[in-house]
């Protein structure tokens, strides 16, 4: 984390948050770990540019990242470890790999992983070692003539002037990127994990190297399943407000259901309503079938829209509280899986509302009806509906 996140960074967080929510919806207890790399070349470069410490840079942007995720209704991870807090674990794992013959220290203290010693290297990315070998430049050209083999990758690197470092048996330095994830995964999830997730750009070499390190150290398979999200591509098409409008339709439907539930004079559902409640179970089935199909959120959202249309048509003023409550419960459960927020936030205070109403009244008295209408529209945009009565202006949140 060396800068503010953009939509491409947020995408995997949202995708895997949805996967997590669905698993929890299905009754699984999910231990969700999302780590932060808080020391690497990009963070150090940013720190030098700003004249501050790497820790200050990473702390600032981790805080901003968490805030942005909260604003997007992404649930906090069960654990969110930071690499710099797990250095000793990295040193221990590297030493284990050296002891087992899978890693070796060079003369300057750099520690490398012996790729060819792990016979299954390339099994995730389906890359062939011979093809990889032919694609590498010579040791002399690459400037890494300490390596036994061009394919070997760094586990520990020596410190450079002005960089953060930690003491180790090999040299003062810092860990390589790949070892960080193996160590934090083992500490918080165990030697063998159920699902490992990330962007498709991480399949090789990062995830491939994680597998090599972890399996050579622990002697068991690293992950049972892998989930990789594709890149987000944005072309020249005009970006519309359709997504926002779609969410507004859902939140409006939820608000109406709450009103029906509260205002209903009849509590228990009629026989016809009970039949319609059975029909609503069909939307749940459609939703689950979509999510079971490789987390097909597009079809899952379509099922939610069908439910909204059904609710708007069938939950009326005379509907029972039971029918309205059940419909709202179904809608809320499905929307929660997708991370959609059904509660409209009260982003305007009562005092502000009263002040604007007073200003509107003054405008009407001055026959400035344009301003009066403008204020009514402003309040409506914020979810406040005005009603002029003989007793004065009444307002309510909608």
Segments from the language model and where they lie:
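N-terminal catalytic cores of NTP/NDP-binding nucleotidyl/phosphoryl-transfer enzymes
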Residues: 1-45, 52, 56, 82-83, ...
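A non-catalytic, amphipathic alpha-helix used as a structural packing/dimerization or gating element
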Residues: 18, 56, 60-67, 249, ...
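A glycine-rich helix N-cap at a beta->alpha junction
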Residues: 62-75, 221-222
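Short secondary-structure capping/junction motifs at helix and strand boundaries
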Residues: 70-81, 100-110
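Alpha-helical recognition segments enriched in aromatics with Gly/Pro capping
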Residues: 1-2, 13-17, 88-258
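Short phosphate-binding/catalytic loops that engage adenosine nucleotides
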Residues: 28, 102, 384
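Alpha-helix C-terminal capping/helix-coil junction sites
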Residues: 24, 70, 98-99, 227, ...
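Structural preference for alpha-helix termini/caps and helix-kink/transition segments
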Residues: 238-240, 244-398
């Amino acid at each position: 984390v060396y800068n503010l996140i953009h939509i491409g960074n947020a995408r995997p967080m949202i995708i895997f948050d949805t996967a997590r929510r669905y698993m929890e919806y299905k009754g699984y207890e999910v231990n969700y770990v999302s780590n932060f790399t808080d020391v690497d070349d990009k963070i150090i470069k940013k720190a030098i540019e700003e004249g501050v410490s790497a820790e200050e840079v990473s702390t600032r942007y981790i805080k901003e990242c968490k805030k942005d995720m909260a604003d997007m209704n992404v649930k906090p991870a069960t654990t969110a470890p930071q690499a710099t807090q797990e250095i000793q674990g990295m040193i221990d794992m590297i030493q284990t790999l050296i002891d087992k013959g899978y890693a070796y220290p060079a003369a300057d203290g750099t520690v490398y992983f012996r790729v060819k010693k792990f016979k299954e290297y390339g099994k995730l990315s389906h890359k062939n070692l011979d093809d990889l070998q032919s694609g590498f430049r010579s040791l002399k050209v690459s400037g890494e003539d300490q390596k036994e083999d061009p394919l070997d990758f760094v586990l520990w690197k020596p410190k450079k002037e002005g960089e953060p470092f930690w003491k180790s048996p090999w040299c003062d330095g810092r860990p390589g990127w790949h070892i960080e994830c193996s160590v934090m995964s083992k500490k918080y999830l165990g030697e063998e994990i159920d699902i490992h997730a990330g962007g498709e750009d991480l399949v090789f070499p990062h995830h491939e190297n994680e597998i090599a390190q972890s399996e050579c150290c622990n002697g068991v398979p690293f992950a049972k399943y892998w989930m990789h999200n594709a890149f987000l591509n944005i072309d020249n098409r005009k970006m519309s407000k359709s997504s926002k409008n779609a969410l507004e339709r859902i939140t409006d439907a939820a608000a109406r259901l709450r009103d029906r539930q509260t205002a209903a004079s009849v509590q228990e559902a009629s026989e016809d309503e009970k039949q319609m409640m059975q029909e609503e179970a069909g939307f749940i089935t459609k939703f689950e079938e979509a999510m079971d199909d490789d987390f097909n959120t597009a079809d899952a959202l379509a099922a939610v829209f069908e439910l909204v249309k059904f609710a708007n048509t069938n939950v009326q003023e005379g509907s029972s509280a039971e029918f309205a409550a059940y419909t709202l419960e179904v809608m809320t459960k499905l929307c929660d899986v997708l991370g959609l927020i059904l509660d409209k936030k009260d982003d305007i205070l009562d005092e502000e509302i009263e002040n604007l109403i007073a200003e509107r009244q003054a405008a009407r008295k001055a026959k400035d009806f344009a301003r009066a209408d403008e204020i009514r529209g402003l309040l409506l945009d914020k979810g406040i509906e005005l009603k002029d009565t003989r007793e004065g202006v009444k307002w309510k949140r909608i």
